[in-house]
């Protein structure tokens, strides 16, 4: 079964947990109580949007780490939505993610990424599998590749946090869209306002985004 066939199959599933709000993905969990939604959106902003002490990786690169973790956990909603968020954030910054690079990321690869991003992907994927498998050698390799302590801390926290989000979505069997295109509108809102802004609230940016560069996110500069 191809990934798209599996995506469509999941979109057609009936939730096995009753009483869920009729919204897709993590939105179903967020609407179970007002405070739960507030804190889940706030955590996403802390991990993916807000300044993090000592971190040098961009918002787009943080979204790519969330995409890789979600792909490893086989959570199609989170994988597709954060891939769309990464593309929207990078486009807003005048950058892009080549499809081949994103496909590699979703299949567990690091092709096309520079050594620092590849090392951070390795850290996030290791923590996703089993946190205690992360070694001092993994951390030292990331530092040697140019990662800061803040970058490494974020890679660990994103792996842990998005494993939680992934299990909320799939444990509740929340609805998944049959096509990644379904996430583009919300992704454009998040690129401008972050996660705490309600859906449909984005306003156009006050100035035009910079002209797109051809350099992809975290690309190897050889």
Task: Pin down the residues of each PLM region.
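Hydrophobic alpha-helical segments
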Residues: 1-222
């Amino acid at each position: 079964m191809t990934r798209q066939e599996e995506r469509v199959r999941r979109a057609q599933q009936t939730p096995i947990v009753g009483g869920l709000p009729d919204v897709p993905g993590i939105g179903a969990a967020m609407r179970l109580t007002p405070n739960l939604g507030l804190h889940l959106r706030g955590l996403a902003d802390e991990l993916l949007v807000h300044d993090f002490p000592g971190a040098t990786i961009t918002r787009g690169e943080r979204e790519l780490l969330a995409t890789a973790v979600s792909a490893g956990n086989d959570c199609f909603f989170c994988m597709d939505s954060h891939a769309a968020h990464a593309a929207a954030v990078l486009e807003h910054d005048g950058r892009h993610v080549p499809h081949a690079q994103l496909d590699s990321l979703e299949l567990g690869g690091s092709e096309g990424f520079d050594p620092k991003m590849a090392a951070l992907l390795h850290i996030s994927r290791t923590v996703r599998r089993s946190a205690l498998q992360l070694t001092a050698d993994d951390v030292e390799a990331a530092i040697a590749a140019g990662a800061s302590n803040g970058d490494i801390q974020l890679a660990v926290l994103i792996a842990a946090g998005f494993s939680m989000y992934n299990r909320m979505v799939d444990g509740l069997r929340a609805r998944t869209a049959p096509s990644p295109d379904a996430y583009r509108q919300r992704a454009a809102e998040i690129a401008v306002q972050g996660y705490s802004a309600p859906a449909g609230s984005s306003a156009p940016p006050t100035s035009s985004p910079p002209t797109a560069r051809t350099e992809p996110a975290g690309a190897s500069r050889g």
